[in-house]
Amino acid sequence: YDSTSTPSAVIGRVEGGVEGFLAKSETPDGRYGAVVQYWLGGDNVEKFAFELSYRIRQDILVKPFMRVFDYPDEKSDEYIEMMDIVGHCGDGYEWTVEEYGRKLINVPIAVPDFQIEEKLSLNKGTMGGNFWYLCETQEAVLEGGKRALDAIQSVTGAIAPFDICSAASKPETNYP
């Protein structure tokens, strides 16, 4: 959750959410996994890649035993190359390897090496939405929010990165 836990779209940074979890039989390396989405408003791929690299390097690479695999829900001809923005965290000691039927960058770190697929796919989608509900009690707010989250999470590909959130996203702000 670390890499998706910082609300930041309102200040022009990448935002993320967990779409769901995968069984061992559903991942390339046979371990439990999570499907995570990252979003940035607009169509500036270079800025998105730069911002995404922060999330990966600061919140995923530093966790022991992590691998990042591409997991697009639909085929895409657009992708981000990971070597320049993440792979070189190996300070020249990184290398590429073919494992699990994928081309991976192996980044040597303390416990053990971090691996990330050479290319991660880009897809377009709709980002940001608000569900407003009016309640008379705090308990009703939480119960209504839980029901809304359950409904959102039952939709394939949908994420609710902030669970029940007291703030609403907007495309621009006067006070970041």
Annotate each language-model stretch with its function.
Residues Y1-F21, F50-P176:
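Conserved mixed alpha/beta catalytic, RNA-binding, or beta-rich assembly cores of soluble enzyme
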Residues S25-D29:
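Long, compositionally biased intrinsically disordered regions
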Residues G33-G41, G128-C135:
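Short cationic amphipathic helices and targeting signals
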